[in-house]
Amino acid sequence: VYRFENGVRRENGRLCWNIDALAAEVVNGLKAAHDAGYTPATIGIDTWAVDFVLLDAEGQRIGDAVAYRDERTEGVREALERDYGLTFAEHYARTGIQYQKFNTVYQLMALKQEHPDQLAAAKMFLMVPDYLNYLLCGVAANEYTNASTTALVGADSKDWDDALIAMLGLPRDIFQSIKTAGTVLG
């Protein structure tokens, strides 16, 4: 019913998604479906994994939606081992996520180094599809399959690994409850 262009662009020295345009295009797509005579009973949002946004106490976005293709995560894996004693073998055993330099944990640690003020101001962490859901229905939640790509979710518990999050000095309270795919949000 509806298609639109999407890509990353350089903002504030980083490769970023135009998240506001993406959100607007989702709404335009829903309007196009309605205009074509379709009335969806439900909406599911599927995007690339690993990318996220932070929101403040008023639900406003903090900073840019930096894309996984950005170079900010260079060397972060090595820094986790050097500075936190977190070997890749231990990390993998906890989360079951293979090493990809763009996994969310490395993005968060790069953000912690570059913009600690953003993490300090954050009240919510939402993966990109979770953020789009939040804009549509006002419910903040982290969907499990996408959250698992953060390398911060326990492979056994299928929930946030609180000890790992604390070890890395990330604010635990920003992570929303994890919901399974297909959970009705609003």
List the predicted regions and their residue ranges:
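Gly/Ser-rich phosphate-binding catalytic loop and adjacent alpha/beta segment
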Residues: 73, 86, 97-101
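Short helix-loop capping/hinge motifs at secondary-structure junctions, enriched
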Residues: 75, 86-87, 117-119
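Helix N-cap/coil-helix junction residues
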Residues: 38, 86, 169-170
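N-terminal glycine/serine-rich phosphate-binding loop of ATP-dependent small-molecule kinases
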Residues: 1-64, 93, 121, 176-177
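Gly/Ser/Thr-rich active-site cleft segment
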Residues: 91-186
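Short, charged, surface-exposed secondary-structure boundary motifs
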Residues: 10-13, 75-79, 152-154
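Carbohydrate-associated surface elements
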Residues: 70
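Hydrophobic or amphipathic alpha-helical targeting/insertion segments
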Residues: 57-61, 79, 83, 90
